[in-house]
């Protein structure tokens, strides 16, 4: 055995790793006696502390056994079927000095605008979290009572929902809310919009349920065997369509006939800048709709907070499971959001983002209209443009070469043939947006 003093790995760790390798290779077998720590240290030219630490570590892991007055022995032999050569460690990444291979900016649908003028309020909220006394034991599985009260007030004011705070369950985001709901539904497939939110379809599949494609641009009159339908009626993801009132009523009637629930993902609902936001679909039938909301688009995705409102029977089932599993949103994030709500910070953030989106959306439309067809109204933090797949890929590749990632509409589709580009404009600067549009339209103009 040899030790490398120039390596960044500590000497005891090197020695322990080499002994493990000798056992795994079969060179050392159960019952073999190792040199004393003093003798091995002398052979290797290191201090005795190095060999003692290595032996102690290997003994703690169950490879070696120290017998008083006798020495140190191997206690573990390589099981049959285990490779005699340990897995090679993954090479550490080297410092990158050239331009990254991947785009540096993302024009996606999930990154909102964050007004730097609001940073002081954001920091103040987290300072308050840092000095607040944490709860002793597990907190309420529904979430902080004060936060639920603030959310109930806000959802009543902005989404038309008349809620008691106890009807709200705070989650770690929309997908967490869906994960909480799926085990409580009766067996059967779940209908998900197509094209639609990819994470929703993948989550349904993860829970062992079949996904039925629900055409996002058609009126739904029959849900078939589906036990639930996942929709984004306020601003369909990714087409941007607002579900008309007649289509909402038709979907609810289809759900009643199928004894299914409608899962309303209230995605991007607050960012209408042409008309007032459409009230939540849950206002039409609280007994049939499971409402999912998130702070990811109005605050930041990394806050990892959302909320769920379900009919009473499902509410109790979800709450019971979350009580047993101690599932729930992180307490610091809940406290921070509570402060942001109480201080009026969230309202300011929404107004600021809405103004920015209202200015950027027409710029995107002006650039793209000569080459593509807008799929929905100008609303929210992205717009979707229909065009042939070869043209969309060519434009996407040009944007990548310029350092920007733009999503293809086809990546959201499962069975529909819709193709085009989904252009987000929340998470970039004005200058970056102009650069990206120049790259996109330059490719489309060829």
Regions found by a protein language model. Name each.
Residues 210, 261, 404-405:
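Residue-level detector of anion-binding/catalytic polar loops
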Residues 69, 283-317, 328-332:
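Active-site PLP attachment segment
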Residues 207, 284-285, 370, 402:
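Short, structured coil segments at secondary-structure junctions
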Residues 1-128, 134-136, 323-329, 338-347, ...:
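N-terminal basic, amphipathic alpha-helical segments
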């Amino acid at each position: 055995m040899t030790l490398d003093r120039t390596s960044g790995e500590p000497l005891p760790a090197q020695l322990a790793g080499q002994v493990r390798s000798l056992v795994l290779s079969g060179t050392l077998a159960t019952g073999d006696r190792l040199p004393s720590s003093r003798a091995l240290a002398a052979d290797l030219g290191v201090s005795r502390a190095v060999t003692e630490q290595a032996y102690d570590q290997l003994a703690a892991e169950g490879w070696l056994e120290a017998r008083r007055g006798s020495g140190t022995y191997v206690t573990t032999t390589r099981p049959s079927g285990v490779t005699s050569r340990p897995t090679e460690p993954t090479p550490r990444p080297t410092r990158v000095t050239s331009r990254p291979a991947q785009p540096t900016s993302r024009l996606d649908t999930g990154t909102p605008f964050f007004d730097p003028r609001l940073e002081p309020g954001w920091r103040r909220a987290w300072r308050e979290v840092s000095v607040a006394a944490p709860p002793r034991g597990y907190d309420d599985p529904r979430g902080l009572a004060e936060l639920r009260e603030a959310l109930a007030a806000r959802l009543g004011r902005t989404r038309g929902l008349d809620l008691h705070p106890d009807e709200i369950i705070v989650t770690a985001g929309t997908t967490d809310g869906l994960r909480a709901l799926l085990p409580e539904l009766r067996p059967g497939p779940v209908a998900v919009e197509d094209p639609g939110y990819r994470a929703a379809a993948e989550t349904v599949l993860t829970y062992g349920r079949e996904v039925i494609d629900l055409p996002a641009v058609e009126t739904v009159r029959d849900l078939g065997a589906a036990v639930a339908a996942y929709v984004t009626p306020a601003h369909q993801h990714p087409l941007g369509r607002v579900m008309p009132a007649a289509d909402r009523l038709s979907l609810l009637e289809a759900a009643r006939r199928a004894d299914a629930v409608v899962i309303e993902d209230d995605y991007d609902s607050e960012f209408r800048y042409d008309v007032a936001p459409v009230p939540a679909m849950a206002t039409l039938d609280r007994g049939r709709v499971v409402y999912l909301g998130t702070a990811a688009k109005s605050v930041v995705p990394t806050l990892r907070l959302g909320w769920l409102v379900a009919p009473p029977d499902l509410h109790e089932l979800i709450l019971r499971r979350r009580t047993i599993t101690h599932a729930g949103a992180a307490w610091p994030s809940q406290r921070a959001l509570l402060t942001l709500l109480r201080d009026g910070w969230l309202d300011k953030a929404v107004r600021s983002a809405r103004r920015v989106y209202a200015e950027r959306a027409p710029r995107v439309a002006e650039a793209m209209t000569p080459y593509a067809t807008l799929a929905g109204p100008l609303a929210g933090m992205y717009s979707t443009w229909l065009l042939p797949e070869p043209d969309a890929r060519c434009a996407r590749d040009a944007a990548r070469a310029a350092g920007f990632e733009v999503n293809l509409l086809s990546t959201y589709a499962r069975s529909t043939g819709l193709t085009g580009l989904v252009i987000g404009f929340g998470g970039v600067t004005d200058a970056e947006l102009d650069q990206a549009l120049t790259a996109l339209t330059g490719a489309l103009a060829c």
